[in-house]
Amino acid sequence: YYASRGLGDVYKRQDKSSFKSDIGYLGQREQTVDINLVVNHYGKSTESEINASGALKDSSSKIFRGTIDFKTGSSDSVGNEKESVLMLGDGVINKTVPLILCAEENVVGNHGATIGELDDETLFYFESRGIGKAEAENILARAAIERLARETGDEETEKLIIKILDEDL
Protein backbone atom coordinates (compact mmCIF):
# COMPACT_ATOMS: atom_id res chain seq x y z
CA TYR A 1 0.00 0.00 0.00
CA TYR A 2 2.99 2.26 0.08
CA ALA A 3 6.64 2.38 -0.75
CA SER A 4 9.10 3.71 1.76
CA ARG A 5 12.50 4.92 0.83
CA GLY A 6 15.39 5.80 3.05
CA LEU A 7 18.48 7.55 1.78
CA GLY A 8 21.38 8.57 3.94
CA ASP A 9 24.95 9.69 3.65
CA VAL A 10 27.20 9.92 6.69
CA TYR A 11 30.58 11.66 6.60
CA LYS A 12 33.16 10.63 9.24
CA ARG A 13 35.63 13.52 8.88
CA GLN A 14 36.86 13.84 12.47
CA ASP A 15 39.53 11.45 13.73
CA LYS A 16 38.28 8.83 16.23
CA SER A 17 34.63 9.63 15.52
CA SER A 18 32.02 6.88 15.48
CA PHE A 19 28.60 6.21 13.98
CA LYS A 20 26.02 3.53 14.73
CA SER A 21 22.79 2.91 12.86
CA ASP A 22 20.07 0.43 13.85
CA ILE A 23 17.46 0.11 11.11
CA GLY A 24 14.20 -1.80 11.40
CA TYR A 25 11.67 -2.46 8.67
CA LEU A 26 8.47 -4.38 8.01
CA GLY A 27 7.27 -5.02 4.47
CA GLN A 28 3.71 -6.29 3.98
CA ARG A 29 1.15 -6.76 1.23
CA GLU A 30 2.58 -5.13 -1.94
CA GLN A 31 4.91 -2.70 -0.14
CA THR A 32 8.40 -1.90 -1.34
CA VAL A 33 11.09 -0.95 1.17
CA ASP A 34 14.14 0.77 -0.37
CA ILE A 35 17.06 1.67 1.91
CA ASN A 36 20.39 3.16 0.83
CA LEU A 37 22.92 4.12 3.51
CA VAL A 38 26.48 5.24 2.73
CA VAL A 39 29.08 5.79 5.46
CA ASN A 40 32.13 7.70 4.21
CA HIS A 41 35.24 7.35 6.40
CA TYR A 42 37.67 10.28 6.00
CA GLY A 43 39.22 10.63 9.46
CA LYS A 44 41.75 8.30 11.06
CA SER A 45 40.59 5.65 13.54
CA THR A 46 36.91 6.15 12.78
CA GLU A 47 34.27 3.49 13.42
CA SER A 48 30.93 2.70 11.87
CA GLU A 49 28.33 0.06 12.60
CA ILE A 50 25.26 -0.56 10.45
CA ASN A 51 22.67 -3.03 11.74
CA ALA A 52 19.46 -3.70 9.85
CA SER A 53 16.75 -6.17 10.76
CA GLY A 54 13.24 -6.75 9.60
CA ALA A 55 10.62 -8.97 8.12
CA LEU A 56 8.99 -9.30 4.72
CA LYS A 57 5.46 -10.68 4.45
CA ASP A 58 2.94 -11.43 1.72
CA SER A 59 4.26 -10.07 -1.62
CA SER A 60 6.43 -7.28 -0.27
CA SER A 61 9.92 -6.50 -1.50
CA LYS A 62 13.00 -4.89 -0.01
CA ILE A 63 16.35 -3.68 -1.21
CA PHE A 64 18.98 -2.66 1.32
CA ARG A 65 22.16 -1.09 0.01
CA GLY A 66 24.69 -0.48 2.76
CA THR A 67 28.01 1.01 1.75
CA ILE A 68 31.10 1.54 3.87
CA ASP A 69 33.60 3.71 1.99
CA PHE A 70 37.13 4.04 3.39
CA LYS A 71 38.53 7.20 1.80
CA THR A 72 42.20 8.18 1.53
CA GLY A 73 43.39 9.24 4.99
CA SER A 74 41.07 6.93 6.96
CA SER A 75 43.75 4.52 8.19
CA ASP A 76 43.06 2.45 11.32
CA SER A 77 39.31 2.73 10.72
CA VAL A 78 36.74 -0.03 11.17
CA GLY A 79 33.36 -0.51 9.52
CA ASN A 80 30.84 -3.28 10.19
CA GLU A 81 27.55 -3.99 8.45
CA LYS A 82 25.04 -6.69 9.38
CA GLU A 83 21.50 -7.48 8.25
CA SER A 84 18.97 -10.04 9.42
CA VAL A 85 15.87 -10.69 7.29
CA LEU A 86 12.89 -12.88 8.14
CA MET A 87 11.03 -13.90 4.97
CA LEU A 88 7.41 -14.75 5.73
CA GLY A 89 5.72 -15.16 2.38
CA ASP A 90 6.04 -17.10 -0.84
CA GLY A 91 5.94 -13.91 -2.89
CA VAL A 92 8.51 -11.82 -1.02
CA ILE A 93 11.57 -10.46 -2.77
CA ASN A 94 14.68 -9.64 -0.76
CA LYS A 95 17.77 -7.92 -2.10
CA THR A 96 20.70 -7.29 0.22
CA VAL A 97 23.57 -5.42 -1.41
CA PRO A 98 26.50 -4.76 0.95
CA LEU A 99 29.45 -2.84 -0.47
CA ILE A 100 32.83 -2.05 1.05
CA LEU A 101 35.03 0.40 -0.84
CA CYS A 102 38.64 0.93 0.14
CA ALA A 103 41.11 3.62 -0.96
CA GLU A 104 43.23 3.32 2.19
CA GLU A 105 45.59 0.79 3.76
CA ASN A 106 45.17 -0.63 7.26
CA VAL A 107 41.38 -0.60 7.59
CA VAL A 108 38.90 -3.32 8.55
CA GLY A 109 35.55 -3.75 6.82
CA ASN A 110 33.09 -6.56 7.54
CA HIS A 111 29.65 -7.38 6.24
CA GLY A 112 27.20 -10.21 6.70
CA ALA A 113 23.57 -11.14 6.22
CA THR A 114 21.26 -13.72 7.76
CA ILE A 115 18.16 -14.63 5.79
CA GLY A 116 15.64 -17.00 7.32
CA GLU A 117 12.11 -18.30 7.22
CA LEU A 118 9.64 -19.66 9.75
CA ASP A 119 10.95 -23.22 10.00
CA ASP A 120 8.86 -26.28 10.82
CA GLU A 121 10.33 -26.67 14.30
CA THR A 122 9.51 -23.08 15.30
CA LEU A 123 6.05 -23.37 13.76
CA PHE A 124 5.47 -26.60 15.71
CA TYR A 125 6.50 -24.79 18.91
CA PHE A 126 3.92 -22.05 18.30
CA GLU A 127 1.19 -24.48 17.20
CA SER A 128 1.72 -26.65 20.30
CA ARG A 129 0.76 -23.53 22.27
CA GLY A 130 -2.37 -22.85 20.24
CA ILE A 131 -0.82 -20.20 18.01
CA GLY A 132 -1.44 -20.58 14.28
CA LYS A 133 0.99 -19.87 11.46
CA ALA A 134 -0.31 -16.36 10.63
CA GLU A 135 -0.15 -15.23 14.26
CA ALA A 136 3.31 -16.81 14.70
CA GLU A 137 4.55 -14.87 11.66
CA ASN A 138 3.17 -11.64 13.13
CA ILE A 139 4.84 -12.32 16.48
CA LEU A 140 8.22 -12.90 14.83
CA ALA A 141 7.87 -9.93 12.47
CA ARG A 142 6.99 -7.70 15.39
CA ALA A 143 9.82 -8.89 17.65
CA ALA A 144 12.70 -7.29 15.73
CA ILE A 145 10.94 -3.94 15.40
CA GLU A 146 9.87 -3.86 19.07
CA ARG A 147 13.46 -4.53 20.15
CA LEU A 148 14.65 -1.51 18.20
CA ALA A 149 11.79 0.60 19.56
CA ARG A 150 12.85 -0.19 23.13
CA GLU A 151 16.46 0.67 22.32
CA THR A 152 15.61 4.21 21.20
CA GLY A 153 15.46 5.31 24.84
CA ASP A 154 12.61 7.65 23.88
CA GLU A 155 9.27 6.66 25.38
CA GLU A 156 7.19 8.65 22.86
CA THR A 157 8.96 7.08 19.89
CA GLU A 158 8.59 3.62 21.40
CA LYS A 159 4.84 4.15 21.95
CA LEU A 160 4.39 5.41 18.39
CA ILE A 161 6.17 2.39 16.91
CA ILE A 162 4.14 -0.03 19.07
CA LYS A 163 0.93 1.75 18.01
CA ILE A 164 1.83 1.36 14.33
CA LEU A 165 2.66 -2.32 14.84
CA ASP A 166 -0.66 -2.84 16.64
CA GLU A 167 -2.49 -1.33 13.67
CA ASP A 168 -0.51 -3.20 11.00
CA LEU A 169 -0.13 -6.67 12.52
Language-model segments: which ranges?
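Amphipathic, heptad-repeat alpha-helical segments used for oligomerization and assembly
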Residues: 94-151
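Extended C-terminal subregions enriched in glycine
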Residues: 58-62, 74-76
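Single conserved hydrophobic/aromatic residue that forms the stacking wall/gate
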Residues: 1-11
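Feature marks extracellular polysaccharide-active and adherence modules
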Residues: 22, 40-42, 71
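A glycine- and small/hydrophobic-rich beta-loop-beta segment
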Residues: 26-27, 35-47, 52-56
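A mid-sequence, solvent-exposed acidic-amphipathic segment
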Residues: 72-107
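Detector for repetitive beta-architecture
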Residues: 9, 16-18, 36-38, 47-49, ...
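Long, compositionally biased
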Residues: 153-169
